[in-house]
């Protein structure tokens, strides 16, 4: 396993995820009967600061359809948590208009690169173009100076 599991922290994430899903109207319990489901949800709501009991609740009451999604969410959250510790792995966000993002995504796809790699490539292309323009301007001035002196 690449990232260390932190039981207490991850239980808090699981609790928040399940409460959010419940508030969004998803069935988070395995029970079909509304009263049993409501009772299990009320029990979950009291367990916010009890990580061990949150995990027991999940084993006993979680809707099987949510199990894989919960695991994937926690795995992604764990990765973001550990990557955020180091500057070079921390993700940054930028605001792009949708059409700009769409064009960038299309270019990245055509080049077979990630969005980040495509942005770096575009920056390098622009820098090379600047260097070329500066060099050509310098050569042009030198040529004019040579022709002007004769």
Curated annotation (Swiss-Prot):
GO molecular function, one term: sequence-specific DNA binding
Keyword Transport: no
Gene3D superfamilies with a match to the protein in the record: MatP, N-terminal domain, Met repressor-like
Gene Ontology BP terms: cell division; regulation of DNA-templated transcription
Location within or outside the cell: Cytoplasm
Disulfide bond entries: none
Record-level GO cellular component terms: cytoplasm
Complex and partners: Homodimer.
Protein's name according to its UniProt entry: Macrodomain Ter protein
Organism (species): Citrobacter rodentium (strain ICC168) (Citrobacter freundii biotype 4280)
Gene name for this UniProt entry: matP
């Amino acid at each position: 396993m690449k990232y260390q599991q932190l039981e207490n922290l991850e239980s808090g994430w699981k609790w928040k995820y399940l409460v959010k899903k419940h508030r969004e109207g998803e069935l988070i319990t395995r029970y079909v009967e509304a009263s049993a489901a409501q009772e299990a949800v009320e029990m979950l709501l009291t367990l916010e600061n009890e990580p061990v009991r949150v995990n027991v609740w999940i084993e006993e009451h979680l809707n099987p359809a949510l199990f894989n999604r919960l695991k994937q969410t926690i795995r992604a959250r764990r990765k973001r948590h550990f990557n955020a510790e180091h500057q070079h792995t921390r993700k940054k966000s930028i605001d792009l208009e949708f059409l700009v993002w769409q064009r960038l995504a299309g270019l990245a796809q055509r080049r077979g690169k990630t969005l980040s790699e495509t942005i770096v490539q575009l920056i390098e292309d622009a820098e090379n173009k600047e260097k070329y323009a500066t060099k050509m301007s310098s050569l042009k001035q030198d040529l004019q100076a040579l022709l002007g002196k004769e």
